[in-house]
Amino acid sequence: MNRDAGWHRTPLGVIRRTLEAAVEDNIPFLASALSFDLLLTALPFVVLLLAAVGYLVQHQITTRQLDVHELLERLLPLSGSDSADMFRHAEAALSALVRARGRLTLLGVPLFLWFSSRLFGGLRVALNEVFDSDENRPWPVAKLTDLSMVFITALLLFANAGLPALKAQSAAALGDGFLVAWLYRFSLELVAFGFSTGLFFLIFEILPSRRLPWRTALVSAVFCALAFEVGKRLYALYLARFVTLDRVASDANLVALFLFLLWVYGMAYAFLLSCEVAEVVDLIRLRRAQRVGLG
């Protein structure tokens, strides 16, 4: 009994309490539901990405007075026996993408808004379940909250996606200095980590019906961002080392698909586990406040 009452005094006790709370709140089941919603949201998101590629290609064709064939010659300087066939396939696919960009947009926008708002609605329900709070906001307010998080997330993701382009453009300007280049790359990594932490912090602060203390939300956001970055880099390492485009149905590519599904589930589980971390940190803060009050 005394050991259970003093769980907050040792790191092992905190970890044990967090895992027990995860089991009590059915975190594995909730993570499966969130993974399914995330995969559904990814489908119209890919459609919108293809539409964006079509608009970008059309913009290049219009501004530079080129056709698709000439544009591909600049982008894909292929050589070898198979280059002609690959070039024809790429030209046909890109031409079809340019023609279908309008239809892809009309299809992708409503589906993306629907499934992404459904995803954040699921996150809202899961957060309320973990934090033991009922949804006391009216339904229109709750749905507007979900949609606002959709646009905030899209804005942060686009800003984060622009970092590799900024890194590539500024690589030549930095020169050959190792220390300067390393510091610049490290600063970009910190900015990317800051984007992830900021996104998770906003999710913890906006979506639940019960407002968390900002310090508790920040601890959970950092935990979730660390788990996301570690999982992303491990998966990218596997893709770089083993995945090949020569044979789509190779064993390595099939394993990559399985690992992607596992990665999605792992990220959903880590997100919900970070909610439990927030709850445990809040309990520790209350225990310490009670000890100070009684002392």
Give residue spans per PLM region.
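Membrane-embedded alpha-helices and immediately adjacent juxtamembrane helical segments
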Residues: 1-295
